[in-house]
Amino acid sequence: MQLGNNIQTLRKKKGLSQEKLAEKINVTRQTISNWELGETAPNPEQLILLSKQFE
């Protein structure tokens, strides 16, 4: 769940909606929601894409 909380916190700090972040890394809004809720986790490639958005 910690990873999901971190994704949500960083996303909000960048002023991104779930939809906008999803578009930027080519996943669905539901995928972002699932990550933030800790239901699923990003794969290594997706983690790299996320890290680039949060630089």
Task: Locate predicted features.
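Short, conserved catalytic or interaction motifs in soluble domains
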Residues: 37
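Secretory-pathway ectodomains
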Residues: 7, 25-27, 54
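A short, Lys/Arg-rich alpha-helix, primarily the initiator
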Residues: 1-13
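DNA major-groove recognition helix of helix-turn-helix/homeodomain DNA-binding modules
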Residues: 45-55
